[in-house]
Amino acid sequence: MSKDRIQLSDHFTTGRLLRFVASPIIMMIFTSVYSVVDGFFISNFAGKTAFSALNLIYPFLQAFGCLGFMVGTGGSALVAMTLGTGDKKQADNLFSMLAASTIVMGIVSTIIGWFLLEPAAQLLGATPELLPNCLMYGRILLVFQTAFMMQFFFQSFFITSEKPKLGLAFTVLAGLTNIVLDFLLVGVLRGGIVGAASATVISQMVGGVGPMFYFFNRKNSSLLHFVRPKFSAKALGKACANGSSELMTNLSASLVSALYNLQLMKLIGADGVAAYGVLMYVGFIFAAVFIGYAQGCAPIISYHYGAENHDELKNLFRKSITMLAIAGVAMFASAQLMATPLAKMFVGYDTGLMELTEHALKLYAFSFLLCGFNIFSSAFFTALNNGAISAAISFLRTLVFQVFAVLVLPMVLDIDGIWYALVFAEAAALLVSAALLAKNRNRYHYA
């Protein structure tokens, strides 16, 4: 066996850990590219009305897609722990059963989402001017919801199967497909929001369907392969419970985004929604680094927890906290320096909107100092198969604290209260995360 191949059972130095998590980090960044690229081309080639419509309906679509993220992250923790006990046959069965369950969830989501799309768009504040674009974009994405969910599912399991580089290759290919098709369909052919939606779903097919062929091939060196699954409601329930924090994070993000949009429509109008859309795109990419790191670490943590290797758990925890602190400072500094060019890139055609976006981004950037610790803390407890604590952190961070901040801070700080809302939520969540990590350190032996 090559000395360069990194296995879950290894001892991880800082360099080895960074090498292992590099692929999932880049995977998450490229996944975030979908909405960012759509937003860039729609804003610059279809105008701010279409751009505002996309940002208004996206939280609704994201709420359905997060089911794949839930089963992927929660299921990968369960499968990695099973591998840690040495039961390869059961790991394959669980992996296959969870994949089939995600496909069924995707089909059901498409049906439900189709009927709820128009009332949801109206509830989210879509005006008669925005509604047609909301419906057109939403219907195209809903038809391919299963591929979207499977893409999230496979991101976690490529890491667990010790094939993060292959997962990265699929994600990069899907991301490049989206970029090229957006350029052709929106930039060259002026296909507007229909072209952007078409580019997105084709790229999701690449990332969500392509990996199936790999895992059906039992001759490759993956730790996991598809087999004829035996359904287990208990295992599916455990995977969903493990991934409930990720479900809560994504559902809450969708609900909170909708609340942001409603507040901004009331305080500023469509320009506020457009500015918030830019913040979300920048936030997607920056948070993708932390989410990718947490996803990359999770199977390692689950494996060593299953193997009762407490020394390695302590090693992983210490190194992670240090690297997250360094990354947070670097991202904050980058966001401050890049606020003007980023605002210009998305909305440079409107001077007033560009200035609003630049100001908002500089305030919003303070959240990058803190969010990495909270994302990791939630994922850490998921990896330890403690879905309850993980979900509690996510629920407070992404819903309770943010809803409070979005509703209350504008009363004190006016529009700046909207831009500071996430900073407040991350600071409050950090206190909760630190307390829970301290309380459970002897139970799980990571510190």
Segments (PLM) and residue ranges:
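N-terminal transmembrane alpha-helices
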Residues: 9-46, 59-74, 78, 103-110, ...
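Hydrophobic transmembrane alpha-helices of multi-pass small-molecule transporters
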Residues: 63-66, 110, 178-183, 208-212, ...
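Transmembrane helical elements of multi-pass membrane transporters/channels
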Residues: 19-38, 140, 174, 203-207, ...
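Transmembrane alpha-helix boundary and packing residues in multipass membrane permease domains
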Residues: 24, 28, 40, 77, ...
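Short runs within selected transmembrane alpha-helices of multi-pass transporters and secretion channels
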Residues: 140-159, 170-178, 196-211, 291-294, ...
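Helix-terminus/linker motif at the lipid-water interface of multi-pass membrane proteins
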Residues: 33-52, 121-128, 184-191, 251-285, ...
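Small-residue-rich hydrophobic transmembrane alpha-helices
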Residues: 51-111, 148-167, 275-333, 337-339, ...
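Short alpha-helical transmembrane segments in multi-pass integral membrane proteins
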Residues: 1-21, 79-144, 188-244, 301-367, ...
